[in-house]
Curated annotation (Swiss-Prot):
One of the GO biological process terms: viral process
Protein name: Replication enhancer protein
Disulphide bonds in the chain: none
Subunit structure as annotated in this protein's UniProt entry: Homooligomer. Interacts with the replication-associated protein (REP). Interacts with host proliferating cell nuclear antigen (PCNA). Interacts with host retinoblastoma-related protein 1 (RBR1), and may thereby deregulate the host cell cycle. Oligomerization and interaction with PCNA are necessary for optimal replication enhancement.
Sequence similarity: Belongs to the geminiviridae replication enhancer protein family.
Length: 134
């Protein structure tokens, strides 16, 4: 849902993409929170934020696009190592596709979490997306 207008995101908006070779460093990855074994659980909770860079947003007609992934895993990774592997694998997946869109980034992250990185229990996605009104 578009946060500014409250309208649902249409399929053409979600599938609108840009070739990967046209934009340098299209995505920013940050770990906003890493909870190590909270409440005596045997799993870590890692929150990763993926931001679209300015040039990519301009091409897609987006004002703001943050994708927040909350990941439950039984691994005990170092924060920087997890981020480096996650970032590399997502960009590798997108390079193989050749196009970057909102749906492709979500699909790439799910592929990495459930097929590449082992012992992922669950992933929860929240987003902050605002399309250009004008």
């Amino acid at each position: 849902m578009d946060l500014r207008t409250g309208e649902l995101i249409t399929a053409p908006q979600a599938m609108n993409g840009v070739y990967t070779w046209e934009i340098n460093n299209p995505l920013y990855f940050t770990i906003t929170r890493h909870q190590q074994r909270p409440f005596l659980l045997n799993q870590d909770i890692i929150t990763v934020q993926v931001r679209f860079n300015h040039n990519l947003r301009k091409e897609l007609g987006i004002h703001k696009c943050f994708l927040n992934f909350r990941i439950w895993t039984t691994l005990r990774p170092q924060t920087g190592l997890f981020l480096r592997v996650f970032r590399y694998q997502v960009l590798k997946y997108l390079d193989n596709i050749g196009v970057i869109s909102i749906n492709d980034v979500i699909r790439a992250a799910c592929h990495v979490l459930f097929n590449v990185i082992e012992k992922t229990i669950e992933c929860q996605l929240t987003h902050e997306i605002k399309f250009n009104v004008y």
